[in-house]
A protein has these predicted regions:
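Cys-dependent protein tyrosine phosphatase-like superfamily
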Residues: 2-129, 144-185
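A phosphate-binding catalytic loop at a beta-strand-loop-alpha-helix junction
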Residues: 129-140
Length: 185
């Protein structure tokens, strides 16, 4: 057998093992589905109690309420373009949905948000909960921390879910992993 055939065989086995590991990891995740609500960007129904999304217009909140969400956790800063915090708060009040504003600055994250986020998401009175920021990066990072600390998931599974939701910022991922390590001590 020549060297090229051996290298190809080894590479083929490696690819097959990698694919199997991905499949096993994905099988451990809840069944997530992409949802479409006009005025909501990048929405994922993570499980029966949690949905994560990116930018959400205040005009979408009545439909969010119609779909049964009890609370909206908004992670956007009031200074972000298109954040509409006051309009979202008013729309939530009008739709009978609890509005929880937890401003989360990616460039200088305040770790105190982690415990407040976990408490709010875990509170049965808020479930099902709709969590959003601008792109789903912050929502996914905070949910990753909750999964790995409060829900007992291993870091790999929590990160795989977060990436599927929308976590793509490497520094935010690193911050989330540091928060997990700090809380798992």
């Amino acid at each position: 057998m020549n060297t090229n055939k051996i290298a190809f065989a080894i590479a083929s086995v490696g690819v097959a093992l990698w694919a199997a590991m991905i499949a096993v990891g994905a099988a451990g995740l809840p069944q997530m589905t992409r949802q479409d609500i006009p005025g909501v960007r990048n929405m994922t129904q993570v499980d029966p109690t949690i949905a994560c999304a990116g930018a959400t217009d205040a005009s979408a909140i009545p439909e969010i309420a119609k779909r049964g969400y009890k609370a909206i956790i908004n992670l956007r800063l009031a200074s972000e373009s298109g954040a509409e915090i006051d309009a979202a708060r008013a729309a939530a009040a009008g739709a009978g949905v609890r509005f929880i504003h937890m401003p989360f600055e990616v460039s200088n994250p305040d770790e105190s948000i982690v415990d407040r986020f976990i408490a709010a998401v875990s509170d049965a009175a808020n479930q099902p909960v709709f969590i959003h920021c601008a792109s789903a990066n912050r929502a996914a990072a905070l949910l990753m921390i909750k999964r790995a600390t409060a829900d007992g998931w291993d870091n790999g599974r929590a990160e795989a879910e977060a990436r599927a939701i929308g976590l793509s910022n490497p520094s935010l991922r690193d911050w989330a992993l540091a928060q997990i390590a700090k809380r798992k001590r």
